[in-house]
Each structure stands twice: as C-alpha cells, then as structure tokens.
Amino acid sequence: MSTKIVAIGDQFIGAQHYQSALNGAPISFDSVDLPGTKEDQHTAQQVMEVKGPNSVDPDNKVLEKIKSANIITAHFAPMGKKLIDVAPDLKLIAVARAGLENVDVQTATSRGIGVVPAFGRNANAVAELQIGLMLAEARNIARADASIKEGGWRKDFPGARIEIGNSTVGMVGFGQIGRAHV
C-alpha cells in the first residue's frame, strides 16, 4: 500500500505547487484547492488566529478528499478536530508555514498524528525586512517621508548623521531569523 498524500491548496499556495514538488515520489497523490477569494481566506485566517482552528469549518470537498489520507499538507487551510476526525489513517500534517494557528495540534497529538511546520520558511525575507527597518529608523526615512508629504522639508532630524557603518546594530536572538543574518 502506498502512502496517500492529500494537498490542500489555498489562495497563496495552490495544490499544483505541492504536486510539482512531490512529482516522482513513490506516493499516491490527491489535491483540492480551497474555494473563495484571498479576502475570504484572510478573514478565515484572522478568525483562526483569535479563536483557534476549530472556529472555521473545513470545506466539504476537503473533507471528502482526505478520508483516506495518510499525510495532509497545507498552508492556511483550517485543520481542526472535524477535519482530523474524518481521516482515520492520518499520520502526519505538514504545514507550509511556521505558524500552527490553523491546526488543532492537541487533537492531532492525542491521536498520534505528527504536526510539522516549516520553521524558517520566510526567515530570509524577515531578516532582510529587519535590516531595512534598522536603516529606515537610523536614517529617519519614515519621518522624512511624512514631513515631505505634509509639505515640509526638514533638515534637522535627530540622529541624521548616524550611519550604520559606524554603529553597533543587531537583533536579539539566534533563531531562524537571527541565523539568516550570519
């Protein structure tokens, strides 16, 4: 019996991307994309971030597809108790992001189902943003932009002569994002 993977695509990572990544693997593969728009997905994400993964019902097409799944891979799809209970052979939930707000980890763990997030998936992007924000703060970019938009042309911002090259700057921690700076 081959391992059956079901990919649940969404408005940001479609199921075809999972299929492409798993092409050639000795598995049985099926997929389904969540219906709706990016706005619908964003609303569902916000609800799950506040109320948890059981606050948004899974799509009926998803429930039908995962009944015989051994592995589910998804990004933001709601994977609460209702979804987990439909798949008696489920062994692993792989999430294509670091956050697990959309997964009922307690239910999965109680059933012996592994839950694997993609820690550090966006670490480089966040590290680059962090460098940009440090530069923006040191050089007063946001305040200068706001002043210009209001018709001003300030020439005297506090710290205007600060240059990163002559400063000690950094971040606290050496997790995924901290290591991206090294």
Predicted regions and their residues:
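N-terminal glycine-/charge-rich "phosphate-binding" loop or analogous flexible N-terminal tail
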Residues: 1-71
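Phosphate-coordination loops involved in phosphoryl transfer and adenosine-cofactor binding
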Residues: 2, 90, 165-168
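Cofactor-binding loop segments of dinucleotide-utilizing enzymes, especially the Rossmann-like FAD-
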Residues: 8-10, 98, 174
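Alpha-helix capping/helix-boundary segments
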Residues: 13, 78-80, 177
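Short gly/ser/thr-rich secondary-structure transition/capping motifs
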Residues: 52-57, 74-75, 149-156
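Short hydrophobic/charged patches on amphipathic alpha-helices used for structural packing
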Residues: 60-63, 81, 161
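Phosphate/diphosphate ligand-binding glycine-rich loop within oxidoreductases
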Residues: 67-145
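Rossmann-like dinucleotide/phosphate-binding beta-alpha-beta segment
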Residues: 158-181
